[in-house]
UniProtKB/Swiss-Prot annotation:
This is RpoH suppressor. It is found in: Cell membrane. GO terms for biological process: lipid catabolic process. A motif (DGA/G) lies at residues 397-399. Keywords: Cell membrane, Hydrolase, Lipid degradation, Lipid metabolism, Membrane, Transmembrane, Transmembrane helix. The gene is suhR. The chain crosses the membrane at residues 38-58, 133-153, 159-179. GO terms for molecular function: hydrolase activity.
């Protein structure tokens, strides 16, 4: 593919299971006019983001004549076009998602219930699944109840008890079916599909999800199969002539959800340390990747007879591992288990008294999430000891907590556009008369609130719609607010999909697959109408308004009267550089004094703006943005 773009952009993609086949063609269309700097996504969007980042690295290698270890036609965006064509071929996605041993019936039931089938078919599938999942237990219960009825009342009693016995046997079968599914899920790491199938190679004429993804990432990036693509490979990739300065050539970010900690986490982990068990990872990843990670980790930590290997993080983290952690659709695709220290002990040969003295609690040393978290397992002490016990930390689909992370690469002012692709289903929400692929073309478009109708013909359907709307609100409220805000909405293209397109529809027809892929191409081409000048100006107006209002609030917070006497010493800490803070001390006297001067400047500027103006918010874009100090993840 001939490419001579001079512009750069970022790209963020939403989760959407099989709807993700929109993304490769969108990236290919964008690549005609732009070169990628930062790429991010969640769930299915993470798969597309990883593939796009790998293709971007491969393209750089081809353009810069660097060595590649793959056939040239499989590397870069030429290879991404081939991968996109494969995804759009009938049956390909279905082959990628293959159930683990013993999970076939439950897998088919989940796909049927979550897919676009009629209520009658779903009901029949649900009722019939009990007999298919637990046939022996159901029949044994029926036989036992029939035998009991015969023993008590003979043939007449057995006939009379036939219907009650069948109902009781069926209900018992429900219990056994649920227990069997629960055991299968736990055995397969909380999912019906692990993504690999090393125990059943004869049944897999094609590669399943994770094996295919590994081969695809290696091919697109031009790396050999035995050397997994890492985030460091992206960061240190070849640079184009005249490329704008940045710390990293290509940045890839994804979102996963830490179920055990109940929070979203960005990938790759750049400071947090986790461990993994080889047996668990061999069930999720290709052996060549696990072997590489074990070698990279070095000597394991052995606790209670189990070996724990340090998970490569930062530049060393394989892109495949991060992608797999983001795409673990709950119950369908296995979650990823990692481990963190639950308790630590002094290293052998250390002096207990000196160790205790050296590791006294010090909040000032907790500069990362890791330090603060591990303080909980060490009694607030610094990390000077080996893990004595581990606890499991489950990571699942990033879409659980952040399904459309359009904020991933935002800065105070943009250096280049960060585009985003949103997947919507207009038949279930009020989107007006928008075209199938919609990008706001002026500031009057894209601001309307999302509306999800609840009313249904039957009470059961309406109750279900109400419950699902609650779940969707918990999952998407922040993303929806951002997507309609000025500075965001003009850079988001919305792709409308019908109920037959994407989702858990694993058996889409050739025509449907072609239609979805075509929408992807249209989405990428839509950004040709994007005005960076208008976007940059809006972002500056947002920043000026928010900074002024925040600075005025700082002045107002300092000036309130009368002040609470008991809190006067606390107020003085920020103003008086000679006072002694209770924690998080500055590293030097100069830093402390500069911070105090900064506060005085902010107060002075806030008082001036509050009294004299001018008001930078009066004609600013609406709804108004706000500055808040919030934790990163």
């Amino acid at each position: 593919m001939a490419r001579t773009p001079a512009k750069y952009c970022d790209l963020v993609m939403k989760g959407g299971i099989t709807s993700g086949i929109v993304y490769p063609n969108a990236a290919l269309a964008l690549a005609r006019d732009y070169r990628f700097k930062n790429i991010g996504g969640t769930s299915a969007g993470a798969i597309a983001a990883a593939a796009c980042a790998a293709a971007a690295v491969g393209d750089r290698r081809k353009q810069m004549k660097a060595a590649i270890a793959q056939p040239e036609e499989r590397v870069g965006f030429e290879g991404l076009a081939k991968a996109s064509a494969n995804l759009a071929s009938p049956g390909f996605i279905k082959d990628l998602l293959q159930p683990a041993a013993g999970a076939g019936q439950a897998f088919r039931l989940l796909v049927t219930l979550a897919g676009n089938t009629g209520v009658l078919r779903k009901g029949v599938a649900l009722l019939g699944s009990v007999v298919r999942i637990a046939p022996v237990e159901t029949l044994l219960l029926l036989a036992a109840l029939a035998g009991l009825a015969y023993a008590v009342g003979g043939q007449t009693g057995m006939i009379a008890a036939a219907l009650p016995a069948a109902i009781c046997a069926y209900l018992g079968g429900v219990v056994f079916a649920v227990l069997r599914i629960a055991r299968v899920l736990r055995r397969n790491l909380m999912g019906l599909c692990t993504g690999t199938a090393p125990d059943q190679p004869a049944r897999r004429p094609r590669m399943v999800l994770t094996d295919w993804l590994h081969e695809t990432l290696q091919a697109l990036s031009g790396k050999a199969s035995g050397q997994p693509l890492t985030f460091g490979d992206l960061w240190t990739a070849e640079r184009y002539p005249g490329e704008p300065g940045s710390d990293r050539a290509v940045t890839l970010k994804m979102i996963t959800t830490g179920i055990s900690h109940q929070e979203p986490r960005s990938l790759p982990f750049e400071s947090a340390l986790f461990w993994f068990r080889r047996k668990e990872f061999e069930a999720l990843f290709p052996k060549v990747v696990v072997d590489w990670m074990v070698e990279k980790a070095g000597e394991p930590v052995t606790v209670a007879g189990e070996d724990y290997y340090l998970l490569p993080h930062g530049a060393d983290m394989p892109v495949l591992v991060a992608t797999r952690m983001s795409l673990s659709f709950p119950l369908l695709i296995s979650a990823v288990p990692l481990h963190e220290p639950a308790r630590r002990e002094s290293l052998p040969g250390s002096d207990g008294e000196n160790e205790a003295e050296d590791t006294t609690s010090d909040e000032d040393e907790q500069k990362t999430v890791l330090d603060s978290t591990e303080a909980l397992t060490t009694g607030g002490k610094k990390r000077r000891a080996r893990p004595a016990a581990f606890r499991i930390c489950w990571f699942s689909d990033g879409g659980i907590s952040s399904n459309f992370p359009i904020h991933l690469f935002d800065r105070a002012l943009p250096r280049w556009p960060t585009f985003a692709i949103n997947l919507v289903y207009p038949e279930t929400s009020d989107t007006g008369s928008r075209p199938e692929v919609f990008l706001p073309e002026n500031n009057r478009q894209g601001w309307q609130r999302h509306y999800q109708p609840i009313a249904r013909k039957s009470a059961v359907h309406e109750l279900c719609a109400f419950v699902f709307a609650i779940v969707a609100t918990m999952q998407n409220w922040r993303d929806l607010l951002q997507s309609r805000a000025p500075g965001h909405r003009e850079r988001i293209v919305h792709v409308s999909l019908s109920p037959q397109e994407g989702g858990l529809n694993l058996a889409m027809s050739k025509e449907v697959l072609a239609a979805v892929s075509k929408k992807g191409t249209a989405a990428g081409e839509a950004f040709a109408r994007f005005s960076f000048e208008n976007h940059y100006w809006i972002r500056w107006r947002n920043l000026a308004s928010a900074l002024q209002r925040y600075t005025i609030d700082i002045a107002a917070s300092d000036a309130y009267r009368p002040k609470i006497p008991d809190y006067e010493p606390a107020y003085a800490l920020a103003h008086d550089a000679t006072s002694k803070p209770p924690s998080y001390r500055f590293a030097s006297k100069a830093e402390r004094e500069e911070a105090a001067r900064l506060l005085e400047k902010l107060i002075g500027e806030g008082e001036k703006w509050s009294g004299e103006g001018p008001d930078l918010t009066k004609t600013a874009p609406r709804p108004l943005p706000q500055l808040q100090i919030a934790p990163t993840y």
